[in-house]
Design a protein with these regions (language model features):
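Short, glycine-anchored, charge-dense loop/turn motifs used at functional sites
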Residues: 244-256, 289
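Terminal processing/anchoring signals of secreted or surface-associated proteins
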Residues: 205-207, 218-221, 253, 274, ...
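Carboxylate-rich, polar loop motifs that coordinate divalent cations or form catalytic acidic clusters
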Residues: 1-216, 255
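Glycine-centered tight-turn motifs at strand-turn-strand junctions
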Residues: 256-284, 296-298
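C-terminal tail/sorting-segment detector
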Residues: 288-310
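Glycine-centered coil/turn sites that cap beta-strands in beta-rich domains
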Residues: 212-247, 259, 274, 297
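Short loop/turn microsegments at loop-to-beta-strand junctions
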Residues: 30, 133, 243-245, 272, ...
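Short, conserved beta-strand segments of beta-strand-rich sandwich/propeller modules, principally
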Residues: 188-190, 285-290
Length: 310
């Protein structure tokens, strides 16, 4: 970015775009830049809100703290992230907000980012409150990871409504509660936390959704008494597609377990984690169990077996 120019390098040449219509004051500097699923560029600034730009038609819009024109909590934006639903998550020096309709950013007359409202012992409050949100990452299951200035890491489901875990120096190996950057390896499920006192990695056991349902397997197998969970996943580096229906039956054909790989039932993305419990919540007996899988429209199926040894 120049003073009011956006520069793109592609195929060995530079292209310049005038973004003065977004009224940026770039003397404050930039904090983050991302591209969403519509190829819209979102630019976070350190004092002038967010600039949205799409080179298709040279469309541009500046988003500020003004109601109906962004509704940001503060003009100083530190972090941006786009998820699989094309929602834009924005971390500022005073809280977190999200644009749920990023696709309409250039057409909407009224466009306000919204905080995520959660219930804390029955009392509504904003997710992360007024924390400074330094970094935001999205994993392979569309779950969210938020790194803050003083509060460590908050890990939520895709909508942000349910907190899966909180990590701090008191309850985890992270060396500091000041999180500078979070990065996710979507292939392995590892999440890397960069703090002001060092870097640590966490194995989230989350996999991205696959494109098609092929050969699957379960591990560990056989499953012994000291194994707490069984993972059902695709072979050869593939993962289960979103919406896959998974049924586990005993040898008599009785349904023991059923779960779709969707938000609200499984948060591991393109694989299923079974805790060896049946639909009544009790641990299953020793024996052979058959796993039946079908994709969302039942056009693809697969099967495997699990041996339980208690």
């Amino acid at each position: 970015l120049g003073k009011k120019e956006l520069k793109k390098f592609s195929n060995g040449s530079w292209t310049e775009f005038n973004i003065s219509a977004g009224k940026p004051n770039l003397s404050f500097g930039l904090s983050d830049i991302i591209i969403d699923r519509n190829n819209t560029l979102w630019i976070g600034t350190r004092g002038d809100g967010v600039i949205a730009f799409n080179e298709n038609g040279n469309r541009i819009k500046g988003l500020t703290t003004t109601p109906t024109q962004g509704g940001l909590p503060k003009m100083r934006v530190l972090s941006l992230a786009s998820d699989t639903e094309n929602r834009i998550w924005i971390g500022t020096i005073s809280g977190l907000v999200v644009f749920n309709n990023a696709s309409g950013v250039f057409d909407a007359d009224v466009l306000d980012a919204q905080p995520i409202i959660i219930l804390d012992d029955g009392t509504p409050r904003k997710l992360l409150g007024d924390e400074t949100v330094n970094t935001i990452a999205v994993d392979g299951a569309n779950n969210k990871w938020f790194g803050t200035e003083n509060g460590g890491v908050t890990y939520t489901n895709p909508s942000g409504q349910n907190t899966i875990a909180n990590f701090s120096k008191q309850n985890s190996p992270i060396p500091s509660d000041r999180i500078v950057k979070i990065a996710v390896d979507k292939d392995t499920g590892k999440v890397f936390f960069a703090t002001d006192k060092g870097i640590v990695a966490y194995n989230s056991n989350v996999a991205p959704f696959g494109d098609s349902l092929g050969e699957v397997y379960a591990y560990p197998n056989p499953v012994r008494k000291f194994h707490d969970i069984v993972t059902i996943d695709g072979r050869n580096g593939t993962n289960l597609p979103k919406g896959t229906n998974v049924k586990i039956l005993d040898v008599a054909g009785n349904l023991v377990y059923e779960s779709n790989v969707v938000e609200g039932q499984q948060l591991q993305g393109g694989k299923v984690i079974w805790d060896k419990k049946n639909l009544a919540g009790t641990y299953v007996a020793s024996g052979i169990y058959v796993v039946l899988l079908a994709n969302e429209d039942a056009s693809e199926t697969s099967t495997t077996k699990i041996a339980i040894i208690n």
